[in-house]
Amino acid sequence: MKEWPPNLAFHNKVIDGAAIKQLISRLIQRFGMLYTSHVLDQVKLLGFKQATASSISLGIDDLLTIPSKRWLVQDAQQQSFLLEKYYQYGNVHAVEKLRQSIEIWDAISAYLRQEMTPNFGMTDPLNPVHIMSFSGARGNASQVNQLIGMRGLMSDPLGQMIDLPIQSNLREGLSLTEYIISSYGARKGVVDTAIRTADAGYLTRRLVDVVQHIIVRGTDCGTTRGLSLSPQNGGVPESTQTLIGRVLAKDIYIGPRCIAVRNQDLGGGLVNRLITFKKKPIYVRTPFTCRSTSWICRFCYGRSPTSACGDLVELGEAVGIIAGQSIGEPGTQLTLRTFHTGGVFTGGTAEQVRAPFNGKIKFNEDLVHPTRTRHGQPAFLCYIDLYLTIESEDIIHSVPIPPKSFLLVQNDQYVESEQVIAEISAGTSTFAFKDRVRKHIYSDSSGEMHSNTGMYHARKFPFSNVHILPKTSHLWILLGDLCGSGPVLFSMYKDQDQMSIHSLSVQGRNTPSLSVNNDQLKHRRLSLYDKNGTGGGSIPILNYSEMTRSLSTARCNLLYPAILHENFSLLAKKRRTRFLIPFQSIQEHRRKNERILCSDISIKIPRNGLFRGNSILAYFDDPRYKIGVSGITKYGTIEVDSIVTKESFINYGGVQPKDEGKVDPLFFIPEEVHIFPETSSIMVRNNSIIGINTKITLNKRSRVGGLVRVKKIHRGIKLQIFSGDISFPRKRDKRFIPQNKDILIPPQIRKRNFNKSKKAKNWIYVQKMRPTNKNSFFLLQPVVTYEIADGINLARLFPPDLLQEIDNIQLRVGNYIRYGDGELIPGISGKNPRIQLVRTFLVLNWDQDKKDSSIEEAHASFVEVSTKGMVRDFLRIHLRKSQIAYAYMRKRNDPSGSGFPSDNELDHSNRNPFSSSYPKARVRQSLNGTIRTLLNRNKECQSLLILSSSNCFRLGPFNNVKYHNPKKESIKRDTDPLIPIRNFSGPLGTVPQIANFDVFYHLITKNRISVFHYLPPEKGKLQVIQSFLMDENGRIYKSDPYSNIFLNPFNFNWYFLQHNYHKNYPNYCEETSTIINLGQFLFETVCIAKNGPRLKSGQVFILQVGYVIIRSGKPYLAIPGATVHGHSGQIVYGGDTLVTFIYEKARSADITQGLPKVDAMFEVRSKNSISMRLKARDEYWNEYITRNLGIYWGLLIGAKLTIAQSSLSLVNEIQKVYRSQGVQIDNRHIELIVRQITSKVLISEDGMSNLFLPGELIGLLQAERTGRALEKGICYRAILVGITKASLNTQSFISEASFQQTARVLAKAALRGRIDWLKGLKENVVLGGMSPAGTGFRGLVHPSSKKYKTLSLETQRKILFDGKVRDLLFHHKRIV
């Protein structure tokens, strides 16, 4: 046997794809291309020989399922079942359920993927599937996991997750449902594949077009800048790929020895040595730092990507086109590869921290606060780095917890080994791809919607039925079957006739109460349309002060207005379902000759004339808050998130407002603001001071004098004139005025800081100004202060109620500011001479204090009544009410006669089927249950809400049930028994407020608490019974040190311990339970008694001594900010949208539809992704640095920093997308594209120059060189442009016209007289010339060298030329 050479190394390991790449690279560097190709041919033949000898084939018997899959899937199913139960109980909302479901199945799929390799290694190491999956030929671990593991969650073509997971694998076979879901992520025919391939091809075309002019035209540009790369920060493969092929920008020293010099290219051996040493950061040259504008040098680019010997790139190489094709071509291949990945969904899960052993948890409670996890579980959130200690008998272990992590255990809690104690959020990047997803929750069944908290109108939809939840609450759907009947015919009845449409008889009863006279009646329909026919106009109302009496009619439910009897006195009558507002009164013979003047009160009525609860009825514009000048509004404490900012409830009986709080004043800073078109000629300069009546344009003069600021806006120019005094700051002024902040100074503070000693009469607005190249100063502007009134007093509008009846209808009066804090009010034009700052609104509501209100909506109409020559117009609002008729359809032989349904009647099996087309007589015979009559959405039909046995259930009797036995426990009392009355928050926003005390000092709240002992009545002071909270283990919680009432916010069943202050029993406690109230909402998890029947979710419908009947309902947990499509008491149908959640969700990691992520980053237009975040970072840098360094230096440094930071961030994020799919792309290709995206700057309006226009896009290097040549700074801002916009803003209009918008580009080029110097490849190809690349580049170079070959250049001339260049670049005015 031949001996092995001693100097040849032998590597005894498996060679995979990565090792083969390294081997080929080393062979090329060591022996060259010819020898390497010979070696590779031998390797190929060896592979064919071994494959033929081994005969490896893939059969179905080789697919071995992982043994642990069965119990893992069962565990996941159990967790999903519990999660669904929590959702039905209302403990978690839909978004939390979705997140937890994703993490459950994703964790199972990841665990199976990890167990796959050890399973093959132990059971069958020579399995063909195991060998082929890691050979690098075809397939990967993810695809093998789908064969023998499970597919898990799938994503649709848009990247959204499908809720139903695929539990089977391809070896076991898929069911029909799983097969249909599985086909979503795969290729769906030729058309879909062609579309996605076309998208990838279009991306390649745009990438090539934006960099087609970048050609290697020089060896060294002379730059001294470079890119800092640290080998120890990233992984070894990433660092090696980033460094190989680069050129050093600085020398590298290891101690005193220089191992690499500047402009030396980095090979594989040198890079490995540098990574091994892990010394200081390495500075390499990059396309970002090349000083050329439209080309690149050899040293800044590095080695050629097409050269096998590792030489530097040749002159004339079209590296731009190579970069565009290198980035775009993998997109087409990845588009076709989506069939193999199958659209499997992958989402980032949180990292869990588990206890290493049994012990007790210790941590600092001051650094955490209670919260809910994204799964809806109670936890603690830590603010900063927290050290959690686990103490056992002999071991103390400390676990560091990073900020924004969740602690799932309590302090001093005993944990077991491997128990999850903390959850660390997934380390998502700042520029992680997230989508704002709207998830709609639909009703499963029909019924009534109720909410246990208040809702306010959405600002965008003031008249719609869309509401916003201010806090976490539950939405209840109380079940009920809807049975519709035929239309209600009112044509057989006359006006003012009484009829009962809620009667259960077949025929109605006609009982006229008022005779009809000969007075005229004119009824105006509510379908209001303006001149354009769009509808929804404003109806003016006359002054209410002329009216001294109001009018209403008796109780009826007609749809038409009433005719008033002549003897009917115009006094207040029953206003239970209707009321009328008089708004016009005039003699009939004067009606046609006189013109009625309208006040500022206007009514806003929806087009259909229907009002919901809390609907805005009317507006009133107070003339005190009208302004005729432009300016800025300022206020600090007034809430403007909702339309209602200050409100008071006022009944129509003349009750005065109560508990009116004081509102902070509204400040208005007058400023003259003008918006001119872009073509306007501005006759004043920016940052200049003008006087009154100064000509600012050809046909416009200023109304005030002051400082002028000119700013370019979108499609126009904004000109502001700031009136006031100017004060230059001193040192003490800088201490008095906060930096970078405008303030308001009250009149109590003297102006000694502004060179004046007299006392100010009004408020002063101080604003810091920074003009270009000048010192900063303070601008002192006068302020107009408005005190917002307390609203309209309705006592003078409506007379007192003589009958002293309680009204259902209520008005809510409030004020809201029409403009936001700091919002600029534009100039006042002739069409709109005055602007209203504060508007008073009137909100219509009814039955505010009643939980059992069944009124759904109010119908508005206008009535014109003529009595004895007097014409009166009324706005009539008719409440459409559905009365609850507790009439149960029972048989006549009911022996009990109690009026309640028996057990047989409430049984679902005894209920006969029914149809909605049955008449009322048939309904009466066939339905068993409570009938609630209500108006349908179609206002012509009636509906019956049937509360049958399927919607109600009975619990009882409770005769043999044992309640909780009282527990006695000694508690030390350290405080006085006098306990202050204090409101406290209960679970999920429920606020039980203390109402009053009875003679026994019994505490009454919304959730009534039964107590066994009362305080002795001889004490004269009111005292609250001291209560404690006991959990299921008998522990007593004390959460608030300033209150003696302790609640557990995560437990819905409240137990209280009550002190007994009797002399004989000074210190003992008793446990009590909650009493069920009529109308109370109960959850299924609540237990009211031991050994009692299990409750279902719903509302207590009937409450008796021996039993209780609960109407079934389903709770939906809603988070703050959720949109509710309806109001409390509204009838909903199955499938209706109840609530909409808005949350952020990470996109799927699988690339579909032709690289949408990469396309979004290159175009800089995607929402909630890196592009928008980079734009926000640019704006922040520009604003922050400008304030501290001034406009010129701030914009210059800010632009440099933002461009550099944005370039690096874009390169890293694009590489992440490609590396996630196993695609390796050289960083230099991406850097060339990103260089074009970040190479443009936007000329700023600050410091206008005669060379560029404000808002013009120019190159960064062009702006720098122009500023040096003119010896004057040019103000500009950094901007990110997409590849499409960058292709349309180049130096060649021929290249732009051949890309997009040909006619527009050529027309603009002709008008501007642009010159195309034909520097790029595309313009030369279009005109049929030779492209300046490759041999064409050499043809351009050689003639010039021959022409000047005979000229002798003197040394002095050369030095003089250097001096001129130095004079141009470094401001030298003389040659020395």
UniProtKB/Swiss-Prot annotation:
The keyword Zinc applies. InterPro entries: DNA-dir_RpoC2_beta_pp, RNA_pol_beta''_euk, RNA_pol_Rpb1_3_sf, RNA_pol_Rpb1_4, RNA_pol_Rpb1_5, Rpb1_funnel_sf. Its main location: plastid. Its cofactor is Zn(2+). Disulfide bonds: none annotated. Its EC number is 2.7.7.6. Transmembrane segments: none annotated. One of its GO terms (biological process) is DNA-templated transcription. Pfam families: RNA_pol_Rpb1_4 (PF05000), RNA_pol_Rpb1_5 (PF04998). CDD domains: RNAP_beta'_C. GO terms for cellular component: chloroplast; DNA-directed RNA polymerase complex; mitochondrion. PANTHER family: DNA-DIRECTED RNA POLYMERASE SUBUNIT BETA. DNA-dependent RNA polymerase catalyzes the transcription of DNA into RNA using the four ribonucleoside triphosphates as substrates. NCBIfam families: rpoC2_cyan. In plastids the minimal PEP RNA polymerase catalytic core is composed of four subunits: alpha, beta, beta', and beta''. When a (nuclear-encoded) sigma factor is associated with the core the holoenzyme is formed, which can initiate transcription. Belongs to the RNA polymerase beta' chain family. RpoC2 subfamily. This is DNA-directed RNA polymerase subunit beta''. It comes from Pelargonium hortorum (Common geranium).
